[in-house]
Amino acid sequence: MKLVDRLTTGDVIYTSCVGIHLCYHLGIVYDDGKKKTVYHNSPYNKNKYGGSVCEESYETFMKEREIMKIIRTSATNYDILDASRKCKTEIWDSFFFNCEDYVLEIVEGHRRSNLRDSWKIAALGIVILIAL
């Protein structure tokens, strides 16, 4: 059995970033009973509304990526579609709307990014070291 066959709606897939080290990328699985796709927010995406949230086949999403981990959540197809409709015109932004913001808005109901917070702490540490 292939991994994609074991995925269910709401599974959050953490993968490597394409061409960038020291980061990860998130997508969330949508299963309509006929096919499984992955919704995600990427600076390389452009949907028909000009935003950066797109739905792709699992195979397309996984091109040039490696799975880091998969987390099962209680997010439903409705949750995914509702959040995607609300932000359909928004463009990926590393500070305000990255892949983690998008997926965690679906799963938790609000935006947040652990990766961005880690980079902020690292930048603050560098500034403090330089100031000393």
Question: Model-predicted segments: where are they?
Answer:
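Short linear sequence motifs
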Residues: G51-C54, I71, R85, F95
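Generic hydrophobic secondary-structure packing signal
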Residues: C23, D79-I80, C99
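Detector for Asparagine
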Residues: N41, N45-N47, N77, N98, ...
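Glycine-rich catalytic cores of cysteine/serine-nucleophile enzymes that process amide/ester linkages
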Residues: V4-K69
